[in-house]
Curated annotation (Swiss-Prot):
The active site is at D8, E67, D139. One of its GO terms (molecular function) is magnesium ion binding. One of its GO terms (cellular component) is cytoplasm. Belongs to the RuvC family. It comes from the Bacteria. Mg(2+) 1 binds at D8, D139. It comes from Actinobacillus pleuropneumoniae serotype 5b (strain L20). The RuvA-RuvB-RuvC complex processes Holliday junction (HJ) DNA during genetic recombination and DNA repair. Endonuclease that resolves HJ intermediates. Cleaves cruciform DNA by making single-stranded nicks across the HJ at symmetrical positions within the homologous arms, yielding a 5'-phosphate and a 3'-hydroxyl group; requires a central core of homology in the junction. The consensus cleavage sequence is 5'-(A/T)TT(C/G)-3'. Cleavage occurs on the 3'-side of the TT dinucleotide at the point of strand exchange. InterPro entries: RNaseH-like_sf, RNaseH_sf, X-over_junc_endoDNase_Mg_BS, X-over_junc_endoDNase_RuvC. Binds 2 Mg(2+) ion per subunit. It catalyses: Endonucleolytic cleavage at a junction such as a reciprocal single-stranded crossover between two homologous DNA duplexes (Holliday junction). This is Crossover junction endodeoxyribonuclease RuvC.
Amino acid sequence: MPIILGIDPGSRVTGYGVIRQTGRHLEYLGSGAIRTSVDDLPTRLKRIYAGVTEIITQFHPDMFAIEQVFMAKNADSALKLGQARGTAIVAAVNHDLPVFEYAARLVKQTVTGIGSADKIQVQDMVTRMLQLSSKPQADAADALAIAITHAHSIQHSLIVAKQSDQKVGSDKEQILALMKTRYSRGRFRLKG
């Protein structure tokens, strides 16, 4: 029953979503956004680090999933996004969490079935998949979609392992070991 923290990084708004996976069932635990003001970038990064650390302390996740960097048209924006991602990853690694990265297109494909889905489609599907009473804000929905993508990746890994007669239970350590094995075969990017 791993708890997965998903992060949608941004230098001004960083979305987060926390779910618990029990087999194929996903349970919503919480979501929201870390908002930074128009302060200088170092202060914003400090707030992102503190916010992610607070979320980790509150929910005690077992795994950390984050969106990969994409090539932006504006180099300055891409650099700031990369710094925000790096800050969130450092917070996770400082809490000994394994870090998994997913491309935005894969996240959208996993949640909506369409790799080019817009934010509203992602919000709608996240709301349905987690049986939420109301739509989460856009950044939180994206973070939940990242966590859902990681949960689906775990489920797929377990199915493949069982089909190849590997003995894998539902123990968190066994799941993590399986995910690392998949990474070593070049199917994932894993840090930590």
